[in-house]
């Protein structure tokens, strides 16, 4: 990108385009700007979906030793009110990769990023459970209230009729998600769409926990989802979008995602007048 400007939505932002047009890179450069600093009380918390509220460089970027050089990258994020523009540049570091992204002109520890909880859901979430060598399960991660809400959201979004008897948190080398069991099948037989949805719902619940536990410190958050529509039925993609908008409004989230789905893009377009009415 050279001299490009774009605006993100107050609640939802969809990024679409041909393959190889740096959609995931856009997600990366936005979320890379944010972290939770050492002195932030929310830093000790861990998301239900695994990882942390500090989106990892390795989940977003694989730099080229040929084309990615120090001082070869720069971008600026502007805010609606109360904050100055924040410019990030690439600087040299020892190790591999030999480039890191940091606030332009700043070198002190803690100056490099803005403190704001962020979750980045990469395509690693789509690794099939069947391909994981070791899995740890836990039936106690969610509260009863969260479990009831999860069951309702799962069946609403997937347009499913079979009652869920239990939900099990699944942790492996590559991801942490949640699977469902019914009288007809258990979590071992869940589809990839169910697995993908479970991870996204856990991310939403994670922000809700921050919102409820830290009412004074929590000001909102950022959720980025790469290829959100992957593995999901088109009608379920639309139902998911409605749920995301509801949670974004309730929890002051900015949710950004990449997609190739025409159904999802049409649904986003239909939401625009609704959003203006909401504002």
PLM feature segments, named:
Residues 252-254:
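Loop/turn-to-beta-strand initiation segments
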Residues 258-260:
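H-loop/switch region of ABC-family ATPase nucleotide-binding domains
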Residues 226-227:
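Walker B catalytic acidic pair
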Residues 119-218:
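Extended helical coiled-coil dimerization/tether regions that scaffold
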Residues 262-266:
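Conserved H-loop
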Residues 1-129, 139-146:
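P-loop NTPase switch/coupling surface
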Residues 277-278:
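Conserved small/polar residues in nucleotide/adenosyl-binding loops
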């Amino acid at each position: 990108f050279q001299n490009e400007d774009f605006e993100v939505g107050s609640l939802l932002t969809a990024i679409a385009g041909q393959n190889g047009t740096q959609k995931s890179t856009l997600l990366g450069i936005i979320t890379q700007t944010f972290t939770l600093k050492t002195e932030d009380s929310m830093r000790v918390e861990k998301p239900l979906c695994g990882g942390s509220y500090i989106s990892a460089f390795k989940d977003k970027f694989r730099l080229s030793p040929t084309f990615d050089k120090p001082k070869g990258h720069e971008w600026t994020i502007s805010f609606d009110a109360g904050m100055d523009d924040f410019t990030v540049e690439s600087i040299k570091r020892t190790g591999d990769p030999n480039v890191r992204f940091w606030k332009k002109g700043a070198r002190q520890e803690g100056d490099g990023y803005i403190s704001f909880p962020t979750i980045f859901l990469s395509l690693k979430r789509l690794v099939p459970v069947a391909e994981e060598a070791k899995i740890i399960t836990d039936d106690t991660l969610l509260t009863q209230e969260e479990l009831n809400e999860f069951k309702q959201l799962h069946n609403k979004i997937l347009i499913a009729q079979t009652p869920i008897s239990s939900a099990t948190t699944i942790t492996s080398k590559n991801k942490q998600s949640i699977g469902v069991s019914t009288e007809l099948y258990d979590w071992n037989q869940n589809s990839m769409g169910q697995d993908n949805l479970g991870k996204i719902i856990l991310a939403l619940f994670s922000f809700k926990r921050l919102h409820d536990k830290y009412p004074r410190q929590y000001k909102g958050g950022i959720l980025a989802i790469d290829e959100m529509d992957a593995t999901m039925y088109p009608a379920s993609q639309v139902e998911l979008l409605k749920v995301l908008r509801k949670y974004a409004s309730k929890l002051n989230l900015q949710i950004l995602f990449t997609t190739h789905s025409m159904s999802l893009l049409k649904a986003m377009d239909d939401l625009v007048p609704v959003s203006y009415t909401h504002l």
